[in-house]
């Protein structure tokens, strides 16, 4: 078994707890998270629903006295299989009669709470990513203190939007790193393999592939740096188009370069002997995670046509 895919690592409660919780909850969760003593998961996706539209959340939380009672089902919850995972930020519907973007809330749910049932893990391109996992979870009358709600009732969609921008930039940074690793592996292989009396690295076609890969990596790196700079200087909302652009460009670029590296490695490239096949699956998954390409392309198109309004 391989270590968990870094691109699917969603142990990301720390930033939300830091920004949106009480001093007591920071003491309980933030310190051990930052110290690496525990892990966390973000539970939003549900079976049978388009996860790119968070307004469709069906898992419900109802306030009974001083407790929220949660019932529902979550799917593809990355990190929840890790025995170190101790808490989930869970997206729930708290008021179905509110305006669409105010129906959802986010609640801290300790993973050992009675009624939390972690079912089977899912395989991604044949890998189970144990122990990290991508889990199917049932919430059956799960009770947590009302203080576990983040920021306040009806602000779940707002929190989700605020956390996705930085998260997408992090994903794209990792895409660049994996593309760099694939390029290094491709050059090393080309320097060590001789075919028909000639090193692969001396063949013009392959040399051009290496050059093209370098251009693509550096183009994407500059796009990512610009998006990160814009988010830092003018904010997440103002950088929305640039973040959407890199979320499409970076995984595509990484997949292209890893695919070329696989080709240079021959049969070994798709075997367990190298990390390329696993890396390809990881980056291909990112064309779906945190919003599929189509959603981001539509956001980019809207921003472009808005210029002419």
Language model: regions and residue ranges:
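A short, Trp-centered hydrophobic/proline-enriched beta-strand micro-motif
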Residues: 36-44
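A short core secondary-structure module
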Residues: 67, 71-119
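Flexible, small-/acidic-enriched active-site or ligand-binding loops
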Residues: 56, 114-143
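Alpha-helical interface subdomain recognition
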Residues: 20-25, 32, 36, 54, ...
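Single conserved hydrophobic/aromatic residue that forms the stacking wall/gate
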Residues: 1-14, 18
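Short Gly/Pro-enriched turn/cap motifs at secondary-structure boundaries
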Residues: 8, 48-52, 78-83, 96-98, ...
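Flexible, glycine-rich active-site loops centered on histidine and acidic residues
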Residues: 15-20, 42-43, 97
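Short, surface-exposed charged micro-motifs
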Residues: 58-60
């Amino acid at each position: 078994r391989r270590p968990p895919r870094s691109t699917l690592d969603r142990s990301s409660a720390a930033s939300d707890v830091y920004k949106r919780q009480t001093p007591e909850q920071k003491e309980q969760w933030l310190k051990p998270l930052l110290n690496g003593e525990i892990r966390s998961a973000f539970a939003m996706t549900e079976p049978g629903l388009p996860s790119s539209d968070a307004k469709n959340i069906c898992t419900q939380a109802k306030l009974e006295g001083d407790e929220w009672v949660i019932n529902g089902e979550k799917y593809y919850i990355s990190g929840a299989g890790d025995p170190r995972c101790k808490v989930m930020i869970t997206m729930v519907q708290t008021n179905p009669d509110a305006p669409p973007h105010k129906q959802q809330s986010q609640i801290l749910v300790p993973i050992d709470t009675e009624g939390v049932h972690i079912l089977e893990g899912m395989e991604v391109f044949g890998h189970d990513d144990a122990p990290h996992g991508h889990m199917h979870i049932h919430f059956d009358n799960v009770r947590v203190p009302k203080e576990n709600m983040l920021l306040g009732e009806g602000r779940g969609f707002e929190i989700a939007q605020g956390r996705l921008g930085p998260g997408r930039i992090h994903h794209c940074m990792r895409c660049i790193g994996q593309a760099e690793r694939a390029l290094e592996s491709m050059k090393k292989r080309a320097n060590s393999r001789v075919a028909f009396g000639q090193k692969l690295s001396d063949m013009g076609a392959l040399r051009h592939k290496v050059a093209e890969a370098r251009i693509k990596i550096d183009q994407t790196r500059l796009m990512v740096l610009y998006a990160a700079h814009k988010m830092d200087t003018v904010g997440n909302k103002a950088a929305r188009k640039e973040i959407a652009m890199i979320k499409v460009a970076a995984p595509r670029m990484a997949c292209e370069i890893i695919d070329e590296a696989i080709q240079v490695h021959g049969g070994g490239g798709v075997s367990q002997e190298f990390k390329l096949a696993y890396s390809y699956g990881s980056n291909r998954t990112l064309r779906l995670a945190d919003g599929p390409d189509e959603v981001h392309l539509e956001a980019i198109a809207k921003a472009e046509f808005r210029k002419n309004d």
